[in-house]
């Protein structure tokens, strides 16, 4: 209950007050709220793709292998035409990224909370260095590069919370809401060789690796 509340509240003092005054029922009452940043879940590392597959699915069942982009983690909240953008640390960067606000506003859903990354690409479609992406999101003034969003998870769509669904269910909702141009490249497989080949192709595109 504490971990869930910590993820959803976006505020440690709010969690502490709820725990002191209402105990577990008060913590359980925290839920997704449009416009309130959600603490992201962070991945752990593995030395090889094969080991990551085994860790994710010891029984050998298929798992999702996704491109890991070397950009800024970005959470997008859409409520009608109102869009807010939050970083990994829950800083509100809405005013700094008008091109991403426009992209999220264009989605054919009434409301959504999406998790993804944003990064800058060069003319050939390869990613710029992380520091270039970071500097392009750091201020409201003149920016050297525009950023492009890519999403890999949906936490809520059209008023429905998805956080208790398995990843496969959340991804189905994401695909229905987000056009392919804004989706992180992905492979579902139980084959270690296929996963390794996919990882090599992602690295060849200039990205950081894969997430399993």
Model-predicted segments: where are they?
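Metal-assisted phosphate- and nucleotidyl-transfer catalytic regions
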Residues: 177-212
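N-terminal nucleic-acid-engaging modules of covalent nucleotidyltransferase systems
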Residues: 1-150, 154-188
